[in-house]
Amino acid sequence: MGRTFIHASKIKHAARKRKHHSNFRTLIKLLNNDAYKIESSKPLKNGKLFKYWKNRRRLFSKIDSASIYMTDELWFSVTPERIACFLANFVKACMPNAERILDVFCGGGGNTIQFAMQFPYVYGVDYSIEHIYCTAKNAQSYGVDDRIWLKRGSWKKLVSKQKLSKIKYDCVFGSPPWGGPEYLRNDVYDLEQHLKPMGITKMLKSFLKLSPNVIMFLPRNSDLNQLSRATRKVLGPFAKCKVLYVKENGYMKGIFCMWGECFFNYEPASTENSRRESSEKEELSSENEELSKRKKHESTTTTKDNTVDIYDVNG
């Protein structure tokens, strides 16, 4: 999709200007057909997505009042709005002077939009032109398309060809494909074998090429031993990863894994978000397979190789 990012507010103009490229021709068709627009009151034809449709307002709170666009895949891959909002506020608290955020697998724009609520320059990358289209349309519905720039491309190719390195990013975020709902079939999620488009070690290394501050949203059953090994292999034997277990409506949704000094050296009690969000403390078992010993107040605990917190985004 060209060498540069496309401003989300000018995506139609950019598509027409570059219509000789196949991806832009596809984009023009999507725009002309108003494709993938969700009718909030009408259940989806795909019955397998019904449980996600029931929770549609958790994905996008404006789904009843504004135009929201999602492909079938995005129904189970978009970060719920409260969780995306929590993360954006958390990053803002840790990096109050940050300006530029890169969202590597932007999907339908769940995280991209919330980052744009907090930061003036947000860049979204995705392999799918349909996802780029959905992000742009959803950003328009939330009124933040003037803060978002988008680019279609394979993450492997973009990194290997250094097509993103001209911009200095304050933080790189990514919610890489987990492999669909099937990720919960195993008790422990293999971060080297099942994470796409590459294992956790290569993924971390590729993100760190663009910024020393990195965040990934990973499955709640991720193998934390693999996470520790990847951290030490890429950053050295004494490096640690900050892990935030995130709950919504009493259910664990996933973990935010963070690398960068700013995520360790911050004062949570001083932020509006932290006053609003309640959190609990839980210890990881030696096998990292179960959480226990819950407490009501926010605290931080360290395992051998990671720092672990748990937050409930509902307060």
Swiss-Prot record:
Entry binding sites for S-adenosyl-L-methionine: D126
Gene Ontology BP terms: 7-methylguanosine cap hypermethylation; meiotic cell cycle; nucleologenesis; regulation of telomere maintenance via telomerase; RNA methylation; tRNA processing
Database matches in Gene3D superfamilies: Vaccinia Virus protein VP39 (3.40.50.150)
GO cellular component terms, A-Z: nucleolus; nucleus
Enzyme Commission number(s) of this protein: 2.1.1.-
Region Required for correct nucleolar localization, residue ranges: 1-58
The protein's name in its UniProt record: Trimethylguanosine synthase
Organism for this UniProt entry: Saccharomyces cerevisiae (strain ATCC 204508 / S288c)
